[in-house]
Amino acid sequence: MRAPQMGSLGFLDKGHIPLVLQLLFLILFTGLLVAIIIQVSKMPSSEEIQWEHTKQEKMYKDLSQLKSEVDRLCRLCPWDWTFFNGNCYFFSKSQRDWHDSMTACKEMGAQLVIIKSHEEQSFLQQTSKKNSYTWMGLSDLNKEGEWYWLDGSPLSDSFEKYWKKGQPNNVGGQDCVEFRDNGWNDAKCEQRKFWICKKIATTCLSKW
C-alpha cells in the first residue's frame, strides 16, 4: 500500500482531506456529548427539588418565629418613657413654662398631655406627685373660664371634680392647668414647671 503523499506545503493530498474532517467532527461530537452529559447530571432530580422546597419552607418558618420573638422584645415606648393603656408618657426632669413645654413635646413627636379617661387621670396624678407641680395640655387662653384641651376638645363635666378646692380661681391671670398634689390647679402660663408628654405607643407590626 502506498503511503499518503504530502503536498508541497507539508499537508496531506486532497484525497485524504475528508478523513481529517471526519476525525475533527468525531472529536467535536464527542466533546459536545460529554458536555451534554455533564449538564444533565447537574440538573436536580424531583427528590432534590422537593428537598429544596422543604428547606425553604423551614427557613420561612424559622424567620417567622424569629420575627415573633423580636415583636415580643420590641419596645412599645422610647427609653425614659412610661407605658400605660396603649400610650407612652414622658415625665420631664426639667422645668419650662407652659408654652415651652408644649413645644418640647412637639419636638419629640408627642403632645402636652391630654387626659381622656378617669383611669388615665388617676395614673398621671399619682405619677406626677414626685415632681409636685406639673403642666398638662389644658387652658382657657382663648376665653376666660372656658377650658379646652390642646386638641380643641372642651373639658368634660365629669372631670370638673378633679379641681382642687376653690379652683380654678384665675388669680392674676392664671390660664394654664397643672397637676398639684391630689388635684388640678390653674396657674400663670409663664411659670416654670415640670411637664408631661403623651403619644400613642408603637405596635411593632411593620411588614416584611
From Swiss-Prot:
Extracellular side stretches: 38-208
GO biological process assignments: endocytosis
Keyword Disulfide bond included in the entry's annotation: yes
Disulphide bonds in the chain: 77-88, 105-197, 176-189
SUPFAM superfamilies in UniProt: C-type lectin-like
Positions on the Cytoplasmic side per record topology: 1-16
Main location as per UniProt: membrane
Keyword Amino-acid biosynthesis: no
Chain segments annotated as transmembrane: 17-37
InterPro entries referenced in this protein's UniProt entry, alphabetically: C-type_lectin-like, C-type_lectin-like/link_sf, C-type_lectin_CS, C-type_Lectin_Receptor_IMM, CD209-like_CTLD, CTDL_fold
GO cellular component terms, semicolon-separated: membrane
GO MF annotation: an example: D-mannose binding
Membrane topology: Single-pass type II membrane protein
Record function comment: Putative pathogen-recognition receptor. May mediate the endocytosis of pathogens which are subsequently degraded in lysosomal compartments.
PANTHER family the UniProt entry points to: CD209 ANTIGEN-LIKE PROTEIN C-LIKE, KILLER CELL LECTIN-LIKE RECEPTOR SUBFAMILY F MEMBER 2
Full protein name: CD209 antigen-like protein E
Gene: Cd209e
